[in-house]
Amino acid sequence: GNKEWTTANIPKVVGGIDAASTAVAQALYEQIVSTVVPVSSPRVAEMVKLLENTFRAVNIGLVNELALMSHRLDVDVWEVIDAANTKPFGFMPFYPGPGLGGHCIPIDPFYLSWKARQNGFESRFIELAGHINAGMPQFVVERVVSALSQNRKPLRDAKVHLFGIAYKPGVGDVRESPA
């Protein structure tokens, strides 16, 4: 799904149960990938992956909330994102959509949140992003119904074509796709 970043050039984080197992994992992955990042334990390696995926989910939730807000304020959220992206530092663009999809982004943040609850910590930010993202398919449907109504087209007579139902461009994987 990404021509620039492949298995070979995406850094691989490894953490073994001790220094020897970390070294073995590192030696194995160095045969396949260009950069291996050793960490102190499997727990740290797992938390790295959870952070990466939760970061995406939370930022998608933020931009989805901005899309909802911009719709109410009659502001083009895409123009806002494009203009904000001209700042050369401190901004990373995320784009609104029908929610989260794929085999890890929709799952990992909620595993992390569940694990936090198991240890007496409430991760409100992650849960809120999940709530916002979970509501996006309904928002998309409401927008379609509204567009049909504005064009005096009854929903029951409408033919709506869905394009791009995979969770990201360039892939055929529809796991957890909100579309």
Set out the residue ranges of the language-model regions:
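Structural/interface elements that position substrates and couple domains in central-metabolism enzymes
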Residues: G1-A179
